Structures are given as C-alpha cells and as structure tokens.
C-alpha cells in the first residue's frame, strides 16, 4: 500500500508546474536593496496579483498608497520581497475540496520564514540571507501531499491529533513517506539550492543534517516557536518542544531556552507576526 502512495506522489512531482517565474527571479535577487530595488519593482509591476497583494496590505493599515514604489517604501525592501515570494509559491498549489484550511498552512509557512529571519538577525547574521526562504518552504511537502494524496494526508493529521504525535511520524505510518522527504524531492525537481532541500528533509531530524545544520536548526527553532505562538496551522498536534540536539545547536548562538530567557524574543516575534496577520 505504501508503494502505491509513493508512486502517486512521485507521479505528481513529475507533473507539477516548474518553479514559478516570480519565485525564480526572487531567488536571483541578492539581499542588497540599493542594487536590487529597481529589479524588485519590475518583478512586481509585471504581476497584477503581486501588485494588488502589496497595495492591499498597506491600505489595510489605514494608509493610502497607489504605487508600487510607495508600497515598497512603506513595507520595506525585505518584507515586500517576502510577500512576493509567499504569494508566488502559494499560487502553484490551488487546493480545492479539502477539509484542511490551506490558508492556515501557508500562514504557518510564512510565519516560520518570518520568525527564522528575526532569529537570524538577532543571533546568527550569516544565516539572514537564506532564513526567510528556508522557513517559507520548509513544509512545502505537506502542500504536495495535501493536493495529491489529500484524503490520506488528512488521515495522518487526524492520527497526529488522536495520538498527540508528530505529524511526520503519522505520515510515515500511513503513506510510507513524510512531508520532509516529499519536499526534498520537489526541491530536487525544481533545482532549488541544496540548503533549502536539507531544511525540508531534516527540520524534524536535525542529527541527520550535515552540510547545512545551522540553517536546519534555525528553521526547526522557528517552526517550534510558531507552533507555540499558534501562528498558522501546519497540522501537527504533537506538543512542541526542543530536542537535546537542537538545544545544543542553539547553545552555540547563546540562545537560552528557558521560558523567561526566551520572552523578549517571543514578544519580538509576536509583534511581527501580528503586523502580518499571521496569528
């Protein structure tokens, strides 16, 4: 039975659209506002949906903005780029007739990317460049499973809820493959960077990460924080907690996982997530 599901997932990966053009263009943008601001404006102006999304976000704050240039000024270069990436990726998978709220899934992914960037800026600046994208895409395998083996994936969510177990364990039991493995195969199909593929594959299994362990640890940490803060819903009903391996990795950045010590970081994340309507 597992073989049947894995074949179905494999077939779906082959038939999936290529990496969205906008996302591919955003991957190529370096994190230098001075050099890339004009390129970002051109990407947005060529896409009516991106333009509308940015303007709607600004105007929902009670500010009146009608132009892309002004919208980027208000949002900031990084947030504007992040919104474009999230929007372009979510359009690849149009989920219909599902009992699962796909928007909450995307909200969780967006939240993890946002928190990963915040943590990187505060504790490990070398990871800032990849932090948001890695966080945004870490659970992309769930979206593939939801779209192509939706009924079985919903059963995995129900099993996670019934047992209070990690969702990836329920996926393994029912499908023979977890969302990390599916996501990593999609990353290979789309020729995404190895660092992103490793995050997808190992964010629930840090000891297996070798080349990009710090980035995997960062996203794992951000994922747990978002689950604690109830930012979106990734369908995982296990009690969020920090493994010894993750605690060791975070200790290298002098991150104290005691609740009181984490409070300032949590408040910082809450403020940013609330600003983006992700809680």
What are these regions (language model features)?
Residues 1-8, 244, 249-279:
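Terminal helices and disordered tails flanking the catalytic cores of nucleotide-processing hydrolases
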Residues 1-155, 167-242, 278:
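Conserved alpha-helical "signature site"
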Residues 160:
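A conserved active-site-flanking secondary-structure segment within enzyme catalytic domains
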Residues 163:
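Active-site-proximal region of nucleotide-activated glycan assembly enzymes
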């Amino acid at each position: 039975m597992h073989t049947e599901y894995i074949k179905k997932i494999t077939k779906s990966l082959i038939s999936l659209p290529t990496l969205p053009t906008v996302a591919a263009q955003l991957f190529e943008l370096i994190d230098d506002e001075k050099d890339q601001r004009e390129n970002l404006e051109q990407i947005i102006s060529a896409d009516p949906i991106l333009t509308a999304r940015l303007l709607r976000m600004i105007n929902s704050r009670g500010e009146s903005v009608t132009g892309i240039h002004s919208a980027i000024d208000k949002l900031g270069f990084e947030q504007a780029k992040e919104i474009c990436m999230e929007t372009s990726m979510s359009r690849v998978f149009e989920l219909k007739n599902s009992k699962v709220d796909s928007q909450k899934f995307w909200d969780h992914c967006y939240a993890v990317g946002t928190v990963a960037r915040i943590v990187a800026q505060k504790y490990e600046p070398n990871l800032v460049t990849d932090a948001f994208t890695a966080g945004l895409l870490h659970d992309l395998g769930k979206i593939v499973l939801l779209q192509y083996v939706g009924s079985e994936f919903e059963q995995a969510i129900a099993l996670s809820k019934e047992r209070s177990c990690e969702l990836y364990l329920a996926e393994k039991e029912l499908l023979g493959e977890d969302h990390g493995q599916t996501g990593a195969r999609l990353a290979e199909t789309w020729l995404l960077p190895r660092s992103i593929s490793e995050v997808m594959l190992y964010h629930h299994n840090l000891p297996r990460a070798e080349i990009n362990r710090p980035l995997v640890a960062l996203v794992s940490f951000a994922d747990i924080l978002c689950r604690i803060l109830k930012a979106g819903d990734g369908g995982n009903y296990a009690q969020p907690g920090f493994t010894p391996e993750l605690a060791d990795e975070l200790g290298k950045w002098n991150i104290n996982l005691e609740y009181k010590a984490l409070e300032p970081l949590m408040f910082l994340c809450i403020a940013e997530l609330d600003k983006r309507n992700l809680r």
